[in-house]
Amino acid sequence: MKVAKIPASKKKRVIRLMGRDRVMTPGDDSFQNHMIKAAGGIPPELGKDGNVVVITKEEWMKFNPQVIYGCGGDRETAKRFFSRPGWKDVEAVREGRIFYFPCDLTCRASTRTGDFVSALASALYQDEFVLKENQVHEEKVFRSRGIKLDLDYVKEGCIACSMIHDFENKTLIIDFKEPMAVISTLEGFREGIETVGNHYSPPPCWGITHRLGLGAERRRIYGVLGKSEKSASLLFTGADMDNLSVQKARFRDMEVYALVTAGVRSNAMRASGDEGKFYEPGTINIIILPNMKLTRRAMTRALITATEAKTAALQDLDVRSSYTPLLNQATGTGTDNVIVARGTGTRIQYTGGHTKMGELIARAVYAGVMEAVFRQNGLIRSRNIFQRLKERGITVAGLVSVDQCECSVESEDLTGGLEEILLQPEYASFVASSMSMSDDHERGLVTDLGAHEHLCQMVAEKIAGKDIDRMIDLVEPDDIPPVMEMTLNALLNGIYRVSDKNFGKARGRNRSKSYP
């Protein structure tokens, strides 16, 4: 309905970028082109059917896409081709209208296809979607459900569903019985606050928000919710309120609630290890509600306690930095925010880690982050080794090189064998323990890798069932840290040497590489 208001003369030419060594795109009969049409775009018609087809430079220039989109892996194709004559000369490349979406949405039809089409349409027509005259639905709250918070000063808690920009937004709203002081990492110390909350904007709204600016969007959201910016303090997130975690920690008469939303897929980062490039509303948002009255300094110190607990949860899950996943765990997302309410009742002056109130805050936040990350991103401690490798940017398919082999072994033989090996708990645990050692080595906590190299030799020989006089380099990427390279290469060498026909045919260099 929303894209139907866009005149045919303003419909944009859109192409899905695919390929690696060549530029490719879905064929004319692909469901991906149907998604482009559903989003109001015009896909290319190349006269070629199939899931993936080659598009020539001449066809590319003739179509002259106004918007290009792909999944994360397609960035390499863009990097390789979009600086070359012809490929770089189309409108989308010249104007920087290139978007990337999660592969799970772009590359397969699913129950979430409708969500992706909405997000794509919003990316294509941000200017049109910003205009109120193009809206289809009235902006208002149309549904809410209660949240029970057993605190004397809380009048009501709920999650309100509202229509904003024609997309469903969700807001955690906590109304107080009387005005109260809060401290917010987004707004600072504020008094006279009657409402705190956490607002979720769905992906189709993100581009619109960036276009309007956070200030204008805040005013719009407050207006729809019937709240005043003077008496309400909200956080903003892209994590769904349906995945909200509500945690309570208690000791005798002392209680603390932590209400947490968390998403760590897109911009998890390590403080001091990653470069900050932009600002956007928080991705891990925490609201802390004590049942006692915190002094101003106790409220401030609670921010540190909550942050420490959040970071502990991320590190216990081994959440990786989105920017340097091979090297660093994440300490946060770089866009996180916390609200601490003063509370009422017995006066509390200290909330550090050695105090009981600090302990309760930490426990509630830790549990909240763990649950919220699971609900939003599906991350748990016991996730499989393939997922953990993927989080570091390592895939089995992209790992193997057979350039050092004289035999007829194919990379598919090694990748298949590696997949089978990693399904065995013994070898999966070997890789998992190597991940921890790799992090310690990168931080300088482990400097001598001799023992690990010896362990890798033993693992390779156990898999092979025979002695191995020399290791050959079977790991393709050259940016994998030394510990992980040794570990994965050991598994591949063991698999490679299982067959007698391969033994002795390797021409690779001796494993004389030195590791600091």
Question: Where do the language-model regions lie?
Answer:
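N-terminal ligand-binding lobe of clamshell/alpha-beta domains
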Residues: M1-E156
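Alpha/propeptide regions of enzymes that mature by internal proteolysis
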Residues: E133-P516
